Amino acid sequence: MSSNSPTNLADRYAFLQAELARLEHAYYVLDNPLLPDIEYDRLYRELLDIEAAHPQWVTSESLSQRVGGTALKEFDSVTHAVPMLSLNNAFEDSELIAFDRRCREALHVEHVAYAGELKFDGLAISLRYENGTLVTAATRGDGASGEDVTANIKTIRAIPLKLTGKNIPEILEVRGEVFMYLKDFEKMNRQAAELGEKEFANPRNAAAGSLRQLDSKITAKRPLSFFAYGLGALEPQSWLPKTHEELLNAYVELGLPVCSERRVLHSVEEILAFYNEIGAKRDSLPYDIDGVVYKVNSFAEQAKLGFVSRAPRFALAHKYPAQEALTTVLGIDVQVGRTGAITPVARLAPVEVGGVTVTNATLHNEDEVKRKDVRIGDTVSVRRAGDVIPEVVSVIKERRPSDAKEFVMPSRCPVCDSHIERLADEAVARCSGGLFCGAQRKQALIHFAHRRALDIEGLGEKIVDQLVDQNLVRTPADLYRLGFTALANLERMGEKSADNLIQAINQSRNTTLARFIFALGIRHVGETTAKDLANHYQSMHALMDASVEELLTVKDVGPVVADSITSFMQEAHNREVIEQLLASGMQLSVEEKIISAAVFGKTFVLTGTFPTMTRDEAKDLLEKAGAKVAGSVSKKTDYVVAGTDAGSKLAKAEELGVPVIDEEEMLNLLK
């Protein structure tokens, strides 16, 4: 460089940006270093020196921005322009064969080409590029919206801040997976051990934990990587290639990292061969996977197949069998689930299963413990079912010690000391503590606030967790004693949100008796039974005092439901909570049915999206008119009400010859 004049310096700065981006792509994406590290570092320091002298030149695309910035207090929410759907899973070859058959039959073709690729065990991410520049990155979240992790994503050197190539779309949302290479994970854990810091259990946890750091400077120190494999929003649509494989090739041209372990497959035989080939070398791959994914290769055929529920019809995840290991049972405890289920859990000598240290494994229920004959002191085979939930598979009885102890199910709940009961025809024992039991409290509150129950908008799982953990709420009745200050002081709860939640709680006092009964969370009492009970008893106190014999006279209430209701009502603390709720100003109305002769006694099934109402609203209208709304289509179904994007229920109705009507025709029947 002959001069330090601003013009020449600006040219040099532009050259360094482009050159360093090229070198990073070669190093982190192509695994083909073009310069020694010392030379790269020299160029990078020169870039930093120029930016220090001319900070006005720095943009979000500068490689210096990968080091991380100011720590955040919380992540903002990002709504996905195109939902990030999950995939249906297959564990058996027969499920894969059925998937291929469904695709061929739906497309009316003899053969379908599939794009086969790996299912990475990391964290799904969406990257939004506008005119080639990375502007937003978000986690999958619930599929509809996720967390804004843009600052953290920019620290991952495998992800380009600026796309390369000539054919760059105006808007491109790249879907992919953030993960850690095994060698990078092991090196990071070794360094953590040397410093006396906590080690991560596995690469997936390390990747997820690193990406969700509020301080991006911490993320910048973590060896995260990325592979692109999917597409979200796109403008213009004319940019879209014809096939998934061509899309991935286009990604490579744009400078995005794409896994090379992929193949276009033309038959079930080729699919199974690909699955077995990857499975054979799974342990030697440089990263963790838990299966392979098949996607119909043609985008036109994908569009024809569409979606069902929260998953595409054109794709399937083929999981590998769970991995197993042997260890010793040190003890057997019981855990209380959110619905009161008592689950025996084996405490194990620590053992590595599928790269995870396992110290506990589920034994499911008392019958399973007896069937497998699991005893304290036994050597057992432990498996991570679905590579997630550890379970005891079998006992190695040849190694059983003479002092091995049998498991005895406790008679009292270890959390609240309520009686543990087990109905004769059920495998699961349950705590009878109901709302009084701390283990069940959070789920009871979430159910109480559900939109089909008391419909308390804004009272979600995260708020409930804080209310219970801070001992602000023990029962649903405590919700109606909450003050503005207590709510406003909760994490992620400002004054406006606190005010809105208090209003929602107050509004919930005016509800129906049926919703109130359903909200109590009595086992076996769903919405329909709650409505039948409300119509029969007309008041809460009448239901509370009902005997089993009286309950059996209610429509569709059998011995199991009657026993469940009386057991719930006989618990003194449950009655106390109900009385507190009633004393808080609850106004419980009994819905009057407006009988329609055209639908009375008829069975309806709802599917798809309706033009003027939700399916829940349609269900309420039909039930008030005396109809029954079922969840699946059968020969006993009288009508299927279908909206747009109707799924498999519509196909089933056509197969069985069940009449299909739209929303307008349903409303005409109700007149």
From Swiss-Prot:
InterPro entries: BRCT_dom, BRCT_dom_sf, DisA/LigA_HHH, DNA_ligase, DNA_ligase_AS, DNA_ligase_CS, DNAligase_adenylation, DNAligase_N. It holds the Pfam family HHH_5. Belongs to the NAD-dependent DNA ligase family. LigA subfamily. This is DNA ligase. SMART domains: BRCT, HhH1, LIGANc. Zn(2+) binds at C413, C416, C431, C437. Coiled coil: none annotated. The keyword DNA damage applies. It comes from Polynucleobacter asymbioticus (strain DSM 18221 / CIP 109841 / QLW-P1DMWA-1). The active site is at K119. It catalyses: NAD(+) + (deoxyribonucleotide)n-3'-hydroxyl + 5'-phospho-(deoxyribonucleotide)m = (deoxyribonucleotide)n+m + AMP + beta-nicotinamide D-nucleotide. NAD(+) binds at D37, I38, E39, Y40, D41, S86, L87, E117, R140, E177, K295, K319. CDD domains: BRCT_DNA_ligase_like, LIGANc. DNA ligase that catalyzes the formation of phosphodiester linkages between 5'-phosphoryl and 3'-hydroxyl groups in double-stranded DNA using NAD as a coenzyme and as the energy source for the reaction. It is essential for DNA replication and repair of damaged DNA. Residues 594-671 form the BRCT domain.
